[in-house]
Amino acid sequence: ADFALVDEALNKLGISHFADRIYMLMSGGEKQLINLARILVQQPQLILFDEPTSALDYGNVFKTLSLIKELSLQGFTIIMTTHNPDHPMLLHSALPHSRVTILNEHGKLQTGTAPEIITEANLKALYQTDLRLVDVPALQRQICAITHL
């Protein structure tokens, strides 16, 4: 691979200090970030992120979602799977053109914008629990919340 592309990808993710580390000795979150850098080096037009924030702490979740937003703004087509309904809602606030698709409880696909698809009815049906969408004025968006244990 072109070393300049590798350096650019590591710098974009803020992980240039990982360049001399051994992959097998890294944490799960660090490996996830290295895997993202490996994708960027390939310069694809379409990027599939399969649960890109699993095993990440909140700081790295922020970096990963910010990167996904930036890649989308740069013209990459992004497909992301997630079990966290807050992520597409958060991305929608930055990328209102983005589309969300869910596999509903009947095995059918539903596609639309995050507010159209991520509804309390869909959340309750998908997760079989009492999830609520709560308006958070300070964030100027809704968040998904578990109402009780």
Regions found by a protein language model. Name each.
Residues 36-37:
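Hydrophobic anchor residue at the start of the ABC signature
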Residues 91-114:
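H-loop (His-switch) and adjacent beta-strand-loop-beta switch element
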Residues 22-26, 30:
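Conserved ABC ATPase signature
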Residues 82-83:
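H-loop/switch region of ABC-family ATPase nucleotide-binding domains
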Residues 114-149:
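ABC ATPase nucleotide-binding domains
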Residues 47-51:
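Catalytic Walker B motif of ABC-type/P-loop ATPase nucleotide-binding domains
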Residues 1-18, 43:
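Conserved ABC ATPase "signature" region
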